[in-house]
Swiss-Prot record:
A GO cellular component entry from the record: Golgi cis cisterna
Residue ranges that the Swiss-Prot or TrEMBL entry lists as coiled coil: 162-200, 233-388, 414-690, 738-769, 799-840
Membrane topology label: Peripheral membrane protein
Protein origin, superkingdom: Eukaryota
Protein name: Golgin subfamily A member 2
Keywords linked to the UniProt accession: Cell cycle, Cell division, Coiled coil, Cytoplasm, Cytoskeleton, Golgi apparatus, Membrane, Microtubule, Mitosis, Protein transport, Transport
Lineage of source species: Eukaryota, Metazoa, Chordata, Craniata, Vertebrata
Functional description taken from the UniProt entry: Peripheral membrane component of the cis-Golgi stack that acts as a membrane skeleton that maintains the structure of the Golgi apparatus, and as a vesicle thether that facilitates vesicle fusion to the Golgi membrane. Required for normal protein transport from the endoplasmic reticulum to the Golgi apparatus and the cell membrane. Plays a central role in mitotic Golgi disassembly. Also plays a key role in spindle pole assembly and centrosome organization.
Family affiliation: Belongs to the GOLGA2 family.
Organism, scientific name: Danio rerio (Zebrafish)
Loss of function: phenotype: Morpholino knocked-down fishes have smaller brain and significantly diminished motility compared to controls, in association with disorganized muscle fibers. Morphants die between 3-4 days post-fertilization (dpf). Other organs such as eyes and heart are not affected by golga2 knockdown.
GO biological process: brain development; cell division; Golgi organization; protein transport; skeletal muscle tissue development; thigmotaxis
Disordered: annotated span: 1-112, 259-280, 756-791, 944-981
Amino acid sequence: MADQNRQIKLAAAKKKLKEFQQKTIPSTGSAGPKKKRKVKGDQTDAPADRRSPENERVDVSQELEEAGAEHVSNPASAINTDNSAPQNYPADANGDEHPLENNRPLSSTESLRQLSQQLNGLLSESSTHINGDSDPPAVNEKELETRNQELSAALDSSALTNTQLTSKLETLTKQSQELSDQLQKERKEFEQKFTKEQGAMREQLQVHIQTIGILVSEKSELQTALSYTQQAARQKAAEAEDLSSRLQASKQRVSELERTLSSVSTQQKQHERHNKELEKERDSLRLEIIRFNNVSEESRQQSSELSEQLKLRVNENSALKLELEDLRKRLEMADVMLQQFSSQSGPPSEHQQLQLLLEEKHQLENHATQLMESVAQLQAERDQYAVQMQEDGRVWKDKTEQLLSQVRLMSEERDSTAAQILELQERIMELENTAAVMSTEQEPQASSQLSGPSETELALQETLRSLQEERDALSLQFQAQVRDNEQLSRLVQEQEVKLQELERQAERASEDAQDRLRILEDVQSDKATISRALTQNRELKDQLAELQNGFVKLTNENMELTSALQSEQHVKKEIARKMGQLQEDLHNAKEQLLESSSELTSVQEQRDQYLAHLQQYSAGYQQLLAEREHLQKQFLQQTQLMDRLQHDEVQGKVQLEQSHMQLQEVQEKLSRLVRDNEELKTEVQELLNGSIMNTSHRDEGDGLESQTLPESFQKSQIAIPEDFESREEMKEFIHSVLSRVEAERDEMSRRLEEERRIHQDTRQQLTALSHDHHHHHHHEPHSTCAETDGSEGVPVEVHEALRVAMEKLQERFTKLMQEKADLKERLEELEHRCIQLSGETDTIGEYIALYQNQRAIMKQKHVEKEQYINMLAKDKEEMKTKLAELQDLVMRLVGERNEWYSRYMSAVGNRDLLNSNAEQIHPAERRMEISGVDAPAVLDMSTAMDVSSSPQSSTAEIQSQSSERPAADPISSPSLRPQEDGTARQIMQLLQEIQNPQSRPAPFLGENPCIPFFYRPDEHDEVKILVV
């Protein structure tokens, strides 16, 4: 506060100096605010300069200089400044306000006077400085009074502020002292707490150091264990990789088998479709057979009619032949007569008659030549017509076959489209069901999502639309195919109508031919035509019989196939049942494995607390290989249990060593007791030697003394080996140690019993001696004084020592027995656990061996399945090739038949021409020749076997017939028959190979040669495969 007053005063003086220098009179209103502002500014600056001693020194020196200057310049005011200086400077130097308050008991008038003197001094100093004169100028007193009043008011306000500030300063000093006291207390408490915490932290540090050492040792052990486990894990990982590769290969093989099974199922479906088509063809062939039967009946009727007509024509021919013979005879007679008439000259009338007869002969010859030409033309026309009929029949057959193939294709396409439509309908139903399920699931979400349908709904709607479009397109295709089928059926009907018309035309043509043949009554070729018609009828009958036999065989084959399929299905059902049983057995075995593993884990969880750190290190690795390493965990846990057993064995060794040490201590105590007993015995012997009256007791005592214990026990030394080669060796060592310890225990107990007995005998001797001594004391008191004192003092001490030793021995022996019993129990527990672990390892090994055996069996069956499937594929390819060969041979046989038939037709035509000039041959012989030549071309399955089995008889017949015929006959040469026999033989051989293939049963199925799969088509002709 003193600094502030001094600064205020100096600022006011400087302002006055400036005002007087400018020769202006400042207003009172402007000075007050400036002072107030300065005061405020000084108050803000005061706390910063309050505690700085350098600023105080500077201010004091400045004030002294100013005071000196004022004293020199104004001697009148020097007194006032000197009086006021001792009041202000001490406060400025010390920074205290209390001296000011104590040295200021002045009144307001004195203060005003001092202020006026100071102002006068200042004014005089300023005037001297300005004018250079020593005389002060005259000042207005009123102004000075007003100035003094203002200054007094300012001083009063400053005093008030000083008092307020001093009170605040006192309160602040008190608060600072309280805070400093609290701070010291807190420092002391903090130091105490810090020392305590430091001690605790040091203790914790030591504990942590110890735990760190333990953990480092454990870490080294765990690292070694972890290295072993990592090696085992790597081995098991390699094994797992091998197993995974094998599993992937087996999966691939299973997928391939599924593919083959699907292909087999598709092939079976195709076979079923083919069977259906064959059944349809069989029905159509039956219809054709019925039609052919009708045609054959009609042909029979026609043949009967033709035979009747032939008989009539034969009669007519015979009549004509008779007439011709008559005419020939007449001609011969006429010739004879002409010769006679030529030789004899006769009248001219006879010559004219001869000429007339010659003319008639020429006319008859011309007429015969014309008839022969017409017959030849009719035969040629007949042959052409037959060829045309055959060509037309072939063309119509080809057309009908093409139409049938088209119909089959269309029916197959219709079936496929129907199946596709059914599949699409099923898919649509499934999608509708899924859409319904999704709609039911999304109903609660619909309330929150009212803005629009979800993406899944839009996708489902799009898929439904696309499927509906596909269904519409397929329905349109189906309708178009149905229309095409209808059009094709119409075309077939039209073709059938055309065929009927052509047949009618053929019948008409045949009728025309019959009409023409009626004209040719004299022609002998009718016999050949009739025989040919008969042979054709026979061929048709043979063909019908062959067709019937073929259909019978087809039906038999179909029945055999159905029976084989049923047997295969039955065998497959049995195989599926067996596989199901095997699966159940495997499942039971897996459950047993899981149960055994769960038991192992439950047994091992009790011991897992010691391996918590190891499990933390190997937790991540075990989680990744948990599914594949159950057996690894079991083996690891077994090794851990063996390590624990070894650790327990080491602990047992330590305990055995401790027990040996204790036994040694007990032996030392026993030796001490023996020594004490010997000392007691010597003392007793001395007492007995000193006693003269009781010789008998001494002899007994000598007898008892003769039964002395050995001087010292041999220390039992048990050499514990560092390493055991096997667990059995460890067990044998522990059993031997226990037997030795038990023997030592028995020996010690025996010795203890002997000591007790000796002790009791000595006590009895001592009591007897005391009685004798007491009895002898009455007779000889003087001689036995010292001896009685000795006999009364020694037995009590000996008794107490022996009692203490016996108690100690009993306690020690009880402790040893208890420890040995505990060791025995612990060893029995360890043996029991070892036996359990060995049994569990054996069971695990058995399970592993069983699993490997089953896996090897399944692998072998899998290989055999593959071999059998490959064999079936090869058989199928061979069957295809054989069928292709059979088809080629049948086509070759048909071509050969057609060629032979055409040659036969041409030969028959040439024979008719030749037979017109040849001699008459009996019709029976000719019929025999025709039947010998005209053998059927298409053989039956059963008759062809007979033909192929007896080729020599047929060749002999052909040779005999050829020998009977003339050599110039081109038809009688059997050049075509052996070729047909060769093709028929090849066909029969192929049929035998197809019907009776080489039976190669699968080795894994036994006697039932069937595919080892179980499949069954459901309602939608879908095969559900059960892969075992």
